[in-house]
């Protein structure tokens, strides 16, 4: 769990997202409160529940980007899901409890990655021994092994071809749920697990170079050193205390007045979410997960529906409400220039691989921002995503001819932007910009 202060979290988010300070502050405080709760003792720790968040704002204003950056920052089990992917229990499709099962799998991957780092040195020793066995045989004299060990460490044998034996992977075999028992204690059963347990792990011999063999051998040796039960227990503890779920497109499951049909299932999804957000126990194949202390952050554009169209009980379970503002021309200009990996920096880096030096003048940046705002106001407003469409249009010719212009410096100024796109922005027919 990250120990960043709210100010540091907001500062980190500022590197990638322009504006939306209210939303940044809300998620920063929520994340810090997770850390504060873990410092409490006994009964008080159990009583402090997370304050779930509802983010409301037009498309392309930064809701999903906040979630993406928060996931990297949190250092905790984090899952982003679209609410539209789920159906009411009894309908064909995934039920909402699958969110928690997926969160557990995410946590297991995280814990394994941490363990792998701590076991790396020990695993490397085992890999070295297995590579020596493949090179000189298990019964070779010690002097021969020592001689080859030195060559191996010096990197002289990296391209030598050897034959190694690896455990057969079973993870890609199909999985299924028990009939009539969604979320049963065993959850999804893997056919691969059944065969592995009944027949034992099968192995497969394969030929590869020493360099290529290192990675799969390291993964296998690390896996052998891990205590799987301890990893699962640690992952479950991490999910129950630090887990964060980001529910995107929550507005798409609102049941609107005067509408029937599919709205029945939408309202059912909301009802299924209620106990999950309030706190319940979800059975997974790794054990039972209590959701009381999992933080839920919901977001939606609410173009057609209103937040009040959500079930009152669900509104009550999302007590912190944050409104994100639509982006203006100045915001677009800052997005193009000030963010850590802005679109301009991305295009400059991409074309630099062809030996082309791309330069944008400040006037060109202002012109790009202005065109994006004009197009957004004329057709559907898709926020900052419009910049990608505009940039692609402006740099279409440069991207196409870049291999023939190696060593050149290409300056993009306001006149160049106007020439490639200005007349289209003034035209009422803007169909080519609609994504």
Swiss-Prot record:
It is found in: Cytoplasm. It comes from the Bacteria. Keywords: ATP-binding, Chaperone, Cytoplasm, Nucleotide-binding, Stress response. SUPFAM superfamilies: P-loop containing nucleoside triphosphate hydrolases. GO terms for cellular component: HslUV protease complex. InterPro entries: AAA+_ATPase, ATP-dep_Clp_protease_ClpX, ATPase_AAA_core, Clp_ATPase_C, HslU, P-loop_NTPase. ATP binds at residues 18, 60-65, 248, 313, 385. GO terms for biological process: protein unfolding; proteolysis involved in protein catabolic process. GO terms for molecular function: ATP binding; ATP hydrolysis activity; peptidase activity; proteasome-activating activity. Pfam families: AAA, AAA_2. Its main location: cytoplasm. PANTHER family: ATP-DEPENDENT CLP PROTEASE ATP-BINDING SUBUNIT CLPX-LIKE, MITOCHONDRIAL-RELATED, ATP-DEPENDENT PROTEASE ATPASE SUBUNIT HSLU. NCBIfam families: hslU, PRK05201.1. Belongs to the ClpX chaperone family. HslU subfamily. ATPase subunit of a proteasome-like degradation complex; this subunit has chaperone activity. The binding of ATP and its subsequent hydrolysis by HslU are essential for unfolding of protein substrates subsequently hydrolyzed by HslV. HslU recognizes the N-terminal part of its protein substrates and unfolds these before they are guided to HslV for hydrolysis. A double ring-shaped homohexamer of HslV is capped on each side by a ring-shaped HslU homohexamer. The assembly of the HslU/HslV complex is dependent on binding of ATP. This is ATP-dependent protease ATPase subunit HslU. The lineage of its organism: Bacteria, Pseudomonadati, Pseudomonadota, Alphaproteobacteria, Hyphomicrobiales.
């Amino acid at each position: 769990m990250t120990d960043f202060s709210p100010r540091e979290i907001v500062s980190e988010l500022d590197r990638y997202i322009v504006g939306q300070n209210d939303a940044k502050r809300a998620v920063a405080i929520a994340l810090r409160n997770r850390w504060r709760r873990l410092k409490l003792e006994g009964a008080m720790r159990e009583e402090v529940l997370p304050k779930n968040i509802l983010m409301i704002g037009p498309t392309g204003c930064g809701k999903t980007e906040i979630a993406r950056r928060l996931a990297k920052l949190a250092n905790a089990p984090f899952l982003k899901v679209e609410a539209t992917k789920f159906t009411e229990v009894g309908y064909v499709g995934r039920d909402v409890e699958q969110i928690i099962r997926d969160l557990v799998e995410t946590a297991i991957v995280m814990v394994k990655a941490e363990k792998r780092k701590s076991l790396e040195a020990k695993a490397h020793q085992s890999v070295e021994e297995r590579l020596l066995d493949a090179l000189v045989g298990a019964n070779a004299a010690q002097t021969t092994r020592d001689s080859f060990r030195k060559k191996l460490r010096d990197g002289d044998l990296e391209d030598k071809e050897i034959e190694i034996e690896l455990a057969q992977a079973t993870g890609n075999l199909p999985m299924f749920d028990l009939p009539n028992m969604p979320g049963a204690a065993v959850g999804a059963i893997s056919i691969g697990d059944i065969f592995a347990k009944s027949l034992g792990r099968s192995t497969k011999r394969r030929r590869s170079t020493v360099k290529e063999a290192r990675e799969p051998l390291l993964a296998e040796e690390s896996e052998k050193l891990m205590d799987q039960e301890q990893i699962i227990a640690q992952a479950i503890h991490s999910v129950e205390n630090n887990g964060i779920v980001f529910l995107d497109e929550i507005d798409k499951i609102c049941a609107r007045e005067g509408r029937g049909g599919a709205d029945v299932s939408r309202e059912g999804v909301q009802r299924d979410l209620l106990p999950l957000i309030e706190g319940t126990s979800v059975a997974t194949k790794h054990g039972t997960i209590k959701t009381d202390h999992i933080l839920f952050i919901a977001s939606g554009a609410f173009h057609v529906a209103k937040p009040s169209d959500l079930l009152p009980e669900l509104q009550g379970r999302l007590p912190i409400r944050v409104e994100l503002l639509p982006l203006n021309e100045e915001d677009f200009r800052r997005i193009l220039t000030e963010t850590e990996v802005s679109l301009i920096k991305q295009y400059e880096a991409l074309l630099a691989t062809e030996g082309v030096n791309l330069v944008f003048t400040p006037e060109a940046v202002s012109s790009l921002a202005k065109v994006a705002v004009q197009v957004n106001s004329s057709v559907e407003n898709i926020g900052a995503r419009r910049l990608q469409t505009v940039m692609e249009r402006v740099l279409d010719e440069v991207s196409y001819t870049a291999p023939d212009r190696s060593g050149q410096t290409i300056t993009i100024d306001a006149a160049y932007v106007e020439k490639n796109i200005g007349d289209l922005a003034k035209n009422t027919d803007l169909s080519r910009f609609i994504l």
